[in-house]
Amino acid sequence: MTTERPLRADARRNRDRLLEVAVRAFSHDGPDVTLEAVAKEAGVGIGTLYRHFPTREALVDAAYRNELARLCDSVADLLAGLPPDRALRTWMDRFVDYTTTKRGMGEALRAVIASGGDPFSESRDRLTTAVTTLLRAGQAAGTLRADVAAEDLLVGLSGISLATESQERREQAGRLLDLLVDGLRPRIAHPSS
């Protein structure tokens, strides 16, 4: 059994830069982007790209998974710096941005699936874990309702993302996210008349 050696610092920077450029390029230009163009924009040679990602599908898959990891891994930093309800609202903005990127990469991701890959295998679990962490923090602080399931919130977020997918509707997405967060707050008991 072989173990992967950690990348040298320069190799890690090159890999990270390739992933960043790939997300932007595939999101903007779709599947027509050449790997040569990705390598050139990343400031590396095509051989460096192929050392990290032997196929186009490997690059697309890694870029998608990297974006998912960045989104989910941001939860701890958000909770460290913001009250839980604000951390959730900020994360929800990032989710909408993430789904916009994913849609832009749609054709490239379909090619990964057609070649036998499954870029979505870990998405649901990672997203559910991230949302559960945010909800539990807000519930513990008393700023979010205790009866909200992470899966339900993800469905709501996905619906908002689909309904406001164009950049022109991004402002509307923000307003809808505000409404969703307001619905997550604990209900105030009103004395009966």
Where are these regions (language model features)?
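Basic, helix-initiating cap at the start of DNA-binding domains
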Residues: 1-41, 58-61
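C-terminal peripheral helix-coil segments that are non-catalytic and often amphipathic
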Residues: 1-3, 129, 133-141, 166-193
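Hydrophobic/aromatic residues within well-ordered alpha-helical segments
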Residues: 14, 67, 71, 92-95, ...
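Helix-turn-helix/winged-helix DNA-binding modules
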Residues: 30-31, 51, 145
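Short hydrophobic/aromatic patch on the recognition helix
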Residues: 43-53
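Hydrophobic alpha-helical connector segments
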Residues: 62, 73-101, 116-119
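Amphipathic alpha-helical packing segments from all-alpha helical-bundle domains
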Residues: 69, 101, 115-143, 148-151, ...
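Short linear capping/connector segments at secondary-structure termini
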Residues: 107-116
